[in-house]
Structures are given as C-alpha cells and as structure tokens.
Amino acid sequence: MTDESTPDAASAPLPAPVPPPDWTGDAPGARAEAGAFTLHTGLLGELVVPGGAARAAELEALAARAAVYATRARGEGTRRVYRSAWRAFEAWCRSLGREPLSGDPELVAMYAVRRADAGVAVSTLRVDLAAIRTAHLLAGVALDMRHPGLAMVVEGVTRGRGARPAKRAAPAVPDVLRLLLGACPPAGTALGARDRAMLLLGFGAALRRSELVALRLGDAEPVPGRGLRLVVRRSKTDQHGRGQDVAVWANPAEPGFCPLAALDAWLAHRTRAKDLDWTAPEAVRRERPLFCAVTKAGRATGEALSDKAVARLVKGAAERAGLDPALYSGHSLRAGLATAAGDLGANLADLMRQTRHRSTDVALGYLRPADLWRNNVTERVFGAGKRDI
C-alpha cells in the first residue's frame, strides 16, 4: 500500500542473515587511499572497503560476477532506495571522520538516533539499516545488527515513535477518478487519449506506476464480451519475471469510464507512431511500449515513459480538477481500486488476486476502513437513531 516512489522495501524487515562472501583482493579503479580499495557492486554502486594489498588478488573477478548477481537480487526501485540510503550514511560517516564500512554497530546506532531525531518514519529507518547491512555483506565486513547497543536503539525508536506507516497517498476512488478523467486534455487528442487510458488501466488493474509504464503493446489483449487481459511481466512481488495475468472488465454502459474503450482510443494514435515498423514481424511490434511520449504537436513518439510520468499525470489532473495535488500520487490509482473494492465488500483473496499483494497485512489495510463499519455492534445498539443521521 505504499507509494512506489518509495518501494515496499521501506516497510520490509531487515534481510535475513547470509554468510559474507570470502572476497580478498583489490577492485579495478581502486582509490589511492591508504589501506582501502573500491569495490564495484551492482546494488550499491562503489564501496570504499578498508583493507590492504593482501586483499587484492581475487576481488577483481569476483566483484564483476557479484555485481551481476547483486543487481538481479533486487528490483530497480529497491536498488535506488538502497543506494540513496547508503550514500547518506557514507556522507555522515565521512563528515565525522569515521569509516562507513567499519563494522561498528555503535556507529550505526548513532546514525539511527540521528535519523530518528530527524523525524524519519520507522519504516524508513529500517530501510537505512538494511542498506547499511547489505553494504557490509557485499564488502565482506562483519556487522552485528543484533548487537545490544544497536538493537536496543531500534527497539526504543520503534516503541517511542510507533511503527505505524506514514500517511499514504489519497486513493483515487471512482468518484475521484472521474474528476481526474474530466481534467485530462480533450479526448480526441493523442495526449488526452493516452492519459485517460493510463488512468483507467492503472486503476482497473491496480498497477504500480513502474508496471504501468513497463507494459508493451503485446501485453494488452481484448477479451470479447469481458474486457482486457493484461500481462504484468515483472513486478515487485514477481522479481523473477514469471509474469502475472490481470483481468479488467469493460464498462460499456459508461464509455467514458471504460478501460477497454479508453485503450482503443489511445491505440488509434499509438499505432501511427513512427517507431512501429509495419514491415517488421508482429513479434517485434508487440515489444514496443504500450504507453509512450506525445509531442507538443500531438503525435505519439514511441519513446517509453518513466514511472515519474505517472505521478506527474495524476498530480496534474488532480490540480486541474480542483483537488490538492499534494494528496495524490501515482500510487493513488492502485490504492483507489483496492479501496473501492473494500467498500463494495470484496474479500481478501479476490482483492489480493487483483492487486497481486504478497502481504495479507498490506492488503487488509484497504479492507479495514470499510470493515470498521460493516456489522459493527454499535449499529444495533444505536440503530434506533439511524434515521436521524
């Protein structure tokens, strides 16, 4: 239920302990820093590792191979968050004249206190600690995350601040989504058609913003008499890319609020883009981006969008609709579908099948607001007064 600008890594527990790699040697491009070398990692970028020439023999080959495996082990969103968290810790250590990869749990505890004093959420602090621990693992430097001096600080921050997640993006429930659709550019334009299709597919398929912009032309298949079948090739809960099918029903009774109609309108513009070579095999065309950039002249370019484009779309439409754009984000579409389903009494299994949540706790968070009132005993106790509400 988190916004994908801050991936679910922000609410994940610390990684399970794994034995550190037995790396000895020096990495290519090592810094001319006494007793240290630079380790190139795929997950956290460059790490300056303490150690002398005795560690130089094997690291070059191992680091190159490890970078590949480390990059595959985490999604791009998680890698961005971890890199940012590690760089912040590294800069803080350097400002104190301390070695970031010292393996000193008390130094990490000091940083945790600093972050807590800065007001970061407990979930954010856990991401910071996960990144620090991962950096030490990659560098082969032991760090005891269960050291009492560190563990007690984290426990104290959690108890004092509470582990309740920070305020979420406002859900774009159907009434809000209609306002966003009405605030899009004219329907007959390529930009208007694209924006409407992105909003309705993002909502209907409960897509994360990275999933929405990753769709290819071959990933959306109309199903006669039903709607659309989307293939989400890779997601935060499917890092190995097995693929997940998502069904989205059409809404012919309300064409302006119909994902299938919106997609058809966009494809009329998309198929005229210059990147589609109609002499090429169909398999090649099917791999082109479903949603792409649109020029000021109103032509689809075929250039893929970044996930930030989804947030800009939602916030821009919210502002034009007279809503507070600060309350909405790219995650509002996914949250809107889940919230609406909860309001309509959807059960947990059906919701998780559509949203592809792996955590029941996260999915239940969308159902609880409605369940709070459903079959509540006070309805019977105070039922006589319902007519006056």
PLM regions: where:
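Extended, non-catalytic subsegments within catalytic or DNA/protein-binding/adaptor domains
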Residues: 1-389
